[in-house]
Amino acid sequence: MDEREKILQAQNLTVSFRTNEGMVRAVRGIDFDLYKGETLAIVGESGSGKSVTARSLMGILAPNAVVDAGSILYEGVDLLKLKEDQFHKYRGNKLGMIFQDPLSSLNPIMKIGKQLTESMLLNEKISKKDAKERALKLLAGVGISDPERRFNQYPFELSGGMRQRVVIAIALSANPEILICDEPTTALDVTIQAQILELINAIKEERRLSVIFITHDMGVVANMADRIAVMYAGKIVEYGTADEIFYQPAHPYTWALLASIPDLDTKEKLESIPGTPPNMLFPPKGDAFAPRNAYAMAIDFEEEPPLFQLSPTHYAATWLLHPNAPKVEPPKIVTERIKRMRTLGGEA
C-alpha cells in the first residue's frame, strides 16, 4: 500500500470533441494519481491525448469539448463537476500551468508587470505596491536579471527563454500546489531547454510542488520524473516509476519511444516509429498501436488488452504480457541502451 499523500486522482477520464466530421475520441478512460512532492510525466506523440488531459485538469477545454465520463478529484472535490465561477478558486490558486509556446501564452500588447500582477489584484486583497514587489521577487526567482526593467517591458522585447521564465513566474504567482507543464521546452533551443528544465526542478524542490510534466520526448523526463505514464491514442498504455519505464519497459510503444531518443554517445541510427497514429474519429478495434507494432499478434487487432500488473507500481496494456503469449524481448537498440545506462550507473 502506498503511504504517500495523494493530492490528485483522475478516474476513467474520457474526453471527446465535436467536429463537423463527428466525435473525436481524444482521451479514452484513463486513470492516474499524483502524490505530494512528486513529478509525474505523461509522455506520448502528438494526438495521444496528453495535452487534452492537462487542459481537463485546469478546466480550460475548448468549447467543442465534451467530458463523456470520469472524475478529477482534488482534496475530495471533483473538479469536473464545478461551474466556471467555482473553478476560479482552484485555477491558479491550487493548480498552475505552464504552456507550450511562451509567445502565445502572453498578451503581446500588455507589459510583463501588468500580466504578472493582474491576477493578484483581482483575487487578493493586495495593494499595487505589494503586488509589484511580489512580481519583482517572482521574476528574480525564475532567473530573470534586472527584474525592474523587465517588469516594464513587452513580451516581444524578451528572448524565447526569458518569455518562458515569465510564464513560469505567472504560473507561480498564486502559490499553486500543483504545477502542470505542457511541453514547456518544445519552442526553445536545446541550451535554453536544459536551463528551463533545471529551473522547474529547482522550483519544485524549493516550493515542494507536485508536478505533471507533459512531453513527447522521453529524453526530457529522464532526470525529472518520479513516475511516467505513456499515452497512445487516448489511453495510458504503460505506467510505472521512472526506473521501471527506462530499465524494464514492457509495451512495444514504450520501446519505440526509447529507441527514438537521440544518443550522442554512439553512432546508432536514429529510429523512427513506422506509420501514423490512428484517426480518433474512428478509434481502432483492439490495441490501437497494433498496425504500427512489429510484435503484434492476431488478438491485438481484435481485443483491447487490459493493464497487466508487473509490480506494485508497474502496469502495461499489451497482450505480450499474457501468460500464453510468446516471450518477446525488446529490440536490440533498446536492450543495448538499458545495458549502457546500467553500466554508467545512470538514474532514470
How would you label these PLM feature ranges?
Residues E3-I7, S16-G29, I60-V66, K83-Q86, ...:
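A short, flexible loop at the N-terminus of ABC-type nucleotide-binding domains that lies
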Residues E45, G59-I60, I180-P184, L188, ...:
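P-loop NTP-binding/switch modules centered on Walker-like glycine-rich loops
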Residues D78, D130-R149, L258:
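Conserved ABC ATPase "signature" region
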